[in-house]
Amino acid sequence: MGIVELRRTAVVKLDVDDDAHRLLQETIDRFTQAAQMVADDGWNGTEDGYIVTSKTELHDRTYNDVREATDELNADLVCAARNRAADALASCAEKRKDGDNPSKPHFTSGSVVYNLNAITYYDEYATLATVDGRIEAE
């Protein structure tokens, strides 16, 4: 029997000052922009008209442009945005295979996917990557 990966989403209220709150909001906005840019590119697809769903191909097609357009959003956050877009595009591609006519993914939610490189946990606080370095949150 193989190893099963289990993922959980933890919703955590962060205690931050006003400056850190502003940086987090700007980070959320740029993360959303990054995900949308990747989704737009993947939706436009290949010359054969297929939706691009490969994370590697989407990375190659969009990474530099997304980093530039988002004023050098943290690299791990750019990759997380790409993964979010790739998952949404894969869902659309599956729906097309099933004969449905899905609409292009549109990202509006105020959330960011942090991996272990973009967030560091300590006993009493955590540090999170933002558009202007890292902030501390309790």
Language-model features: locations:
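Nucleic-acid substrate recognition interfaces
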Residues: 1-138
